[in-house]
A protein has these predicted regions:
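Re-entrant/interfacial helical elements at transmembrane boundaries that shape
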Residues: 224-237, 267-279
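Core transmembrane alpha-helical segments of multi-pass membrane transporters/permeases
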Residues: 64, 124-133, 150-184
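Membrane-interface alpha-helices at helix entry/exit sites of multi-pass transporters
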Residues: 201-202, 242-250, 279-292
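Juxtamembrane and boundary regions of transmembrane helices in multi-pass small-molecule transporters
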Residues: 18-32, 257-309
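Short helix-coil transition sites and intra-membrane helix breaks within transmembrane domains
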Residues: 164, 177-184, 216-229, 259-268
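Alpha-helical transmembrane segments of multi-pass membrane proteins
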Residues: 202-215, 242-263
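Transmembrane-helix bundle segments that line or gate the permeation/cavity pathway
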Residues: 11-31, 37-88
Length: 309
């Protein structure tokens, strides 16, 4: 076991740390007797922790079954919120006044330290994020005079509020990989070519931008959509056929994809997680607020791309 730890890469240590934290959340859920869904919730986070700690050593089939088991827990509605030993509202208000704006220092440290490590070292941004999170945690404990135990309870409260959407980013990344293996890009290219006249630049631009929006909404990730839609429409039908500037249309296509991000629950980190953290009544309140701006920006992106052709 120790030999395996010594051979681990820096990023593996970050995954190990995340897995240990998720394991602690699982144990806390199992021990929370006031939690109506403590077995299902604890099992969900336990399976998730296993994927982080042992995922590299397990077969693809076993990792796949772990995901299916987690999905089954959500399907039968056994994932829910519990009791988190929160401080009284009066105490929170008093601490907010006492600490003031200094409370934002840990959050700022995460971004600053991640940037420094990612930009000036060879460790990479993800490793930098892990190191930054540890330092920020220490700063938060020093500023608030809280305890590690309290920190884990708050962490569990937040992860339970986020719920199943916490695993959505990984699932969407896998979906993008499967789409590429299945040759979806070629299918899209053939379908668009059969409907949109190749000599009509404006219609090709519309197809490119709307394609970015639709696939971003499906996959929840503009980067994954970009690889497929650009190889299917952007490169052959705009760059090759009409001599478009690849840098310009690529940048604008990403902006069009972000319009899709504003309109989909699949972009959970942006549109669903804030709803859970802010305890909004309308599950799609964030999306509804962003929808008009997204549509306006989409039209502007189409016109801007057409201008650069």
């Amino acid at each position: 076991m120790l030999e395996l730890i010594y051979k681990m890469q820096p990023l593996d240590y970050v995954y190990l740390l995340v897995g240990i934290i998720l394991f602690i959340f699982a144990i806390q859920s199992f021990l929370n007797k006031d939690h109506k869904y403590r077995i299902g919730t604890g099992l969900f986070w336990l399976l998730y922790s296993v994927s982080f700690i042992f995922g590299s050593y397990l077969s693809k089939e076993i990792n796949g079954w772990l995901v299916i088991a987690m999905a089954a827990i959500v399907l039968v509605k056994q994932l829910g919120k519990g009791h988190y030993f929160e401080s009284p509202i009066e105490f929170k208000k008093g601490e907010a006044v006492r600490i003031g704006n200094i409370i934002f220092i840990p959050a700022l440290l995460v971004g600053i330290i991640t940037f420094i490590i990612g930009f000036f070292t060879k460790l990479g941004a993800l490793v930098g994020l892990g190191i930054a999170a540890i330092i920020a945690m220490g700063a938060a404990l020093y500023i608030t005079k809280g305890s590690f135990n309290q920190g884990f309870h708050e962490g569990r409260r937040l992860i339970d509020a986020i719920g199943w959407t916490a695993i959505l980013s990984q699932l969407l990344a896998a979906l993008g990989y499967l789409f590429n293996l299945a040759g979806v890009g070629k299918i899209i290219s053939s379908a668009v070519a059969s409907v949109v006249p190749a000599d009509n630049v404006f219609l090709v631009v519309v197809a490119y931008c709307i394609g970015m929006v639709i696939f971003t909404m499906i996959m929840g990730n503009a980067f994954a959509a970009f690889a497929m839609i650009t190889s299917a429409i952007g490169v052959p039908m705009l760059v090759v056929a009409h001599g478009a500037n690849p840098a310009a249309i690529g940048a604008i296509a990403m902006l069009a994809g972000y319009c899709g991000t504003l309109m989909t629950p699949m972009a959970a980190n942006f549109n669903i997680v804030p709803v859970a953290l802010l305890e909004m009544r309308d599950q799609y309140g964030v999306i509804k607020a962003q929808l008009p701006i997204a549509l306006i920006m989409l039209v502007l992106n189409i016109l801007l791309m057409y201008y650069f052709i």
